[in-house]
């Protein structure tokens, strides 16, 4: 039911007179014996109307008509007494009259809100002084979540009220239901003056909420540079862990949210154990997660490792692997990581296949030859199988870069890929001299496959093909990063083409591969 809207047809004539401050009409109604305790749809009686609308004389008349404690303290359906309503509007005289008549300065609404809290919320310092004079409790919970008046004053940045509450004995370390103190609130919302007052009063700058977040962490997260500076100069610890897993620090928050000025403050002060330490998470991951290139470069420039440590928290083996999840920031982040020496491996090639970044796949092959043995060959093959429908965009590049096709010829590849792909893979081998285990799997596959696959396996490789394989066996992997080395061999162009499998590519209608250039990758790479 909506208790915020007053329905005109539910308000009594006495209530309406009190609302309008019509003393003359109210006096006549009282003389006629009209009731003063008829409630409207919100549970508001005439005493509530007079208090909320600052009808001083009407309130006095109502109290003279019934000065009982029950009437003075009567509540609306939401648990507001007349004192709450007057405090919410800052009606000093009304509040004085109610308090003198016996109103409870510590009364609470259904949401456990006190008149003192409402006075603070509305910035009514004179009302606050009056309530305190009549015994309002400056401590304790003033709202349902345990948030009290000092929290509210700190949130609003009301310096006068903060000073008054502290002077009257407010607990500067009071916590709400989430373990948050007023100082934490000031840091969270960037209330620099509130923060300064609380620090000067001795409030703990290293307090922690129930989730272990600190004022420094929350200020760094929210981008309040001046608050971060004040906290650091006041003894806030940048190495105090801010989560249960003991890895999250203020530097992570600044990096993830892109607050470069704060990051610049924290980099020289933060212990480097988070860089590559086991069971930690490098802030490099945070910068990549947030997609903030400037923060990423700041960290790497200051000496943080571009490879970091394996991150079980986010499920990535390196920041470069995480970068694949960043659509709009991908190329900028990858370029920065490579610029600072990020090590490429087969997992990065696998992620290229997973996210169908085939141009980047070819670029990575150029930057990092597929050296053996691979530590994550199974994961690579799984992604390769899923990307088989677009094999022409990546498989030729992989095999021409010197990747041993025998690494592909495992049971999952042989059983899963199409005949065309399997035949294409075999073109880079001597298919009549394969390991027995591979021959057995191919024979089983061929028995249930097309005539083309059966014919290919049964055929004898040409002498020229065997010579090609022999020449390739003497090439180093770095010679195969591009076709440049082979093109420079003192051989006719037709032999260059043959060594580069031109006839195989042509037969399989593989498009001409892009000519790679050194430099940064982009959407057009």
UniProtKB/Swiss-Prot annotation:
Keywords linked to the UniProt accession: ANK repeat, Repeat, Ubl conjugation pathway
Keyword field contains Secreted: no
Matching InterPro entries: Ankyrin_rpt, Ankyrin_rpt-contain_sf, ASB3_SOCS, SOCS_box, SOCS_box-like_dom_sf
Pfam short name (any one): Ank_2
Domain SOCS box, first and last residues per copy: 441-505
ANK repeats by residue range: 9-38, 42-71, 78-107, 111-140, 145-174, 178-207, 211-240, 246-275, 279-308, 315-346, 348-373
Signal sequence segment: none
Pathway: Protein modification; protein ubiquitination
GO biological-process terms attached to the record: intracellular signal transduction; protein ubiquitination
Gene3D superfamilies: Ankyrin repeat-containing domain, SOCS box
Subunit organization: Interacts with ELOB and TNFRSF1B.
Family membership noted in the UniProt record: Belongs to the ankyrin SOCS box (ASB) family.
Biological role: Probable substrate-recognition component of a SCF-like ECS (Elongin-Cullin-SOCS-box protein) E3 ubiquitin-protein ligase complex which mediates the ubiquitination and subsequent proteasomal degradation of target proteins. Recognizes TNFRSF1B.
Domain notes: The SOCS box domain mediates the interaction with the Elongin BC complex, an adapter module in different E3 ubiquitin-protein ligase complexes.
Name assigned to this protein: Ankyrin repeat and SOCS box protein 3
Species in which this protein is naturally found: Bos taurus (Bovine)
Gene: ASB3
């Amino acid at each position: 039911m909506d208790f915020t809207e007053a329905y005109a047809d539910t308000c009594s004539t006495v209530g309406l007179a009190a609302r309008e401050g019509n003393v003359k009409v109210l006096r006549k109604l009282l003389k006629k014996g009209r009731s003063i305790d008829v409630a409207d749809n919100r549970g508001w009686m005439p005493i509530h109307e007079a208090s909320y609308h600052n009808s001083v004389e009407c309130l006095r008349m109502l109290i003279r008509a019934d000065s009982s404690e029950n009437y003075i303290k009567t509540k609306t359906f939401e648990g507001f007494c007349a004192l709450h309503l007057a405090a919410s509007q800052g009606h000093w005289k009304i509040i004085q009259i109610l308090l003198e008549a016996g109103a409870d300065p510590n009364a609470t609404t259904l949401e456990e809100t006190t008149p003192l809290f409402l006075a603070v919320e509305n910035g009514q310092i004179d009302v606050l002084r009056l309530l305190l004079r009549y015994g309002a409790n400056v401590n304790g919970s003033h709202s349902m979540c345990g948030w009290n008046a000092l929290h509210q004053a700190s949130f609003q940045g009301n310096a006068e009220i903060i000073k008054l509450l502290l002077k009257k004995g407010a607990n500067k370390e009071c916590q709400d239901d989430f373990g948050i103190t007023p100082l934490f609130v000031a840091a969270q919302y960037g209330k620099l003056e509130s923060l300064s007052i609380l620090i000067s009063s001795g409030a703990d700058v290293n307090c922690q909420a129930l989730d272990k977040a600190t004022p420094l962490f929350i200020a760094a997260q929210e981008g309040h540079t001046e608050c971060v500076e004040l906290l650091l100069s006041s003894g806030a610890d940048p190495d105090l862990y801010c989560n249960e897993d003991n890895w999250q620090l203020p530097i992570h928050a600044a990096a993830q949210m892109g607050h470069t000025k704060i990051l610049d403050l924290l980099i020289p002060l933060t212990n480097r154990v988070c860089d590559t330490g086991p069971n930690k998470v490098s802030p490099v991951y945070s910068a990549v997660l947030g997609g903030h290139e400037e923060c990423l470069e700041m960290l790497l420039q200051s000496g943080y490792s571009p490879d970091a440590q394996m991150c079980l928290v986010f499920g990535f083996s390196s920041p470069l692997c995480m970068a694949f999840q960043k659509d709009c920031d991908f190329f900028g982040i990858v370029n920065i990581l490579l610029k600072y020496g990020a090590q490429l491996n087969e997992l990065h090639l696998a992620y290229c296949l997973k996210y169908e970044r085939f141009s980047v796949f070819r670029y990575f092959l150029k930057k990092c030859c597929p050296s053996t043995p691979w530590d994550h060959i199974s994961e690579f093959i799984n992604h390769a199988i899923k990307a088989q429908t677009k094999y022409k965009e990546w498989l030729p590049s992989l095999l021409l870069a010197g990747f041993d096709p025998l690494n592909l010829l495992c049971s999952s590849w042989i059983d899963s890929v199409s005949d065309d792909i399997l035949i294409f893979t075999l073109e880079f081998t001597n298919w009549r001299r394969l390991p027995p285990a591979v021959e057995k799997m191919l024979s089983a596959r061929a028995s249930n496959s097309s005539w083309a696959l059966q014919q290919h396996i049964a055929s004898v490789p040409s002498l020229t093909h065997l010579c090609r394989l022999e020449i390739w066996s003497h090439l180093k992997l770095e010679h195969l990063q591009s076709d440049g080395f082979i093109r420079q061999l003192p051989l006719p162009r037709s032999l260059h083409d043959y060594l580069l499998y031109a006839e195989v590519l042509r037969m399989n209608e593989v498009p001409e591969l892009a000519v790679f250039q050194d430099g940064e990758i982009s959407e057009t790479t």
